[in-house]
Amino acid sequence: MKAYERLLSYVKVFTPSSEETGTSPSTQYQFDLARLLVQELKELGVKDADVDEHCYVYGHIPATRGYESRQKLGFIAHMDTVSDFCDHLVTPVITPNYDGKDLALGTSGRVLSPKMFPHLSTLKGRTLITSDGTTILGADDKAGIAEIMTMIESLNDNTIPHGPLCIAFTPDEEIGMGPAHFDIKKFGADFAYTLDGDTEGEIQYENFNAARAVVEFTGVNVHPGSSKNTMVNAALVAMEFNSMLPSADTPRDTEDYEGFFHLYSIKGDVSHAALEYIIRDHNATTFDVRKKTMKHITKILNEKWGKGTVSLTITEQYRNMKEIIDTCMELIERATAACKEYNIPPLITPIRGGTDGAQLSFMGLPCPNLGTGGHAYHGPYEHITVEGMNIAVEVGLKIIELFYK
């Protein structure tokens, strides 16, 4: 079975994660895909495949003869999707021989256009997979799962010698909780790769330092006709807080190694308001400055409007794995060589986000990230090509070959 055929099957399984439940996994939907994957792994000969109570799927492939004592290499992808644009089942749409131009996404009224996504012109002639425009596609990260499964099938059909291989599919990556209950010992790998990137040939070992900030505002609500010098409008103080952050430090205005504050939720009225942000920066020093900036604004506004008007809670999420991967750069060198074997330009880029691998690296499992061939994740314009997925599979297999050469 081809990788894209698996993807078409997986995206039809509803698996959004949720920040609201406080459970692990955050949604029971994810077990539906986990059980399907366990069954498929067993059919592919991964005899010990199982899913645990927290919805982590594990499996192991024995070494070929003579390679039993070699280091163990792992591959990881995540089963959950974002909850945005995911209120009903995905309907994947295949467009053979894509012409590189505007493409209407079903009857949604949305158009996938090179004006918005310039790389689309480079996909001309490929077989493009999208949703119908009413949901995400779910290639993030079901494409990674499909590619790992196809790699396993290919290993069964060819003679690539290899040491022990370890496979894992995780829940709740999209809410930053993928490694929360990851059993490093059970997984067993010395090194691993996540398949959770974008363009095929992408190799990533630098990610954001990340934190979440919740800012709450307590107002004083009195009748507006008699409120002079008395009312404190929590909603207006919230607006004031946001206006004091650097106006150009938003996701829309930044790229590459530039960090940002991202306001993703606003709720409020006169009595109470709340702003929720994510804070991101590749540079640890600048990351700390961003957190201090929010603390300083909180102090200023409390001095202006009264003690207790503004409260700030910052929660650390993950760190830049570069400091770990720098000690085992052979992982990057092998991935780079694997791309070159197929005349695919290796794209070494910083991750403007995080992956399970970032946290796993700090848990003792160095784990850079590889591209799956997908683009425009987390929204209705998400897309991937059959050819890009095929290349990602070949690169993964070549990494295995080079790792044990």
Describe these PLM feature segments.
Residues 22-70, 74-76, 80:
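A non-catalytic alpha/beta surface segment that caps or lines the substrate-entry region
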Residues 185, 194-227, 231-237:
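Phosphate/diphosphate-binding glycine-rich loops and adjacent basic-rich segments that engage nucleotide
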Residues 2-28, 129-130, 318, 378-379:
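N-terminal capping segment at the start of a domain
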Residues 67-161, 169, 391:
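Active-site metal-coordination/substrate-binding segment of hydrolases
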Residues 120-135, 218-222, 342, 374-378:
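Glycine/charged-rich beta-loop-alpha catalytic/anionic-binding loops adjacent to active sites
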Residues 121-208, 248-264, 268, 272-282, ...:
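Acidic/histidine-rich catalytic neighborhood of metal-dependent amide-processing enzymes
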Residues 130-139, 176, 221-228, 379, ...:
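A short glycine/serine-rich beta->alpha loop
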Residues 235-405:
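Metal-dependent amide/peptide-bond hydrolase catalytic core
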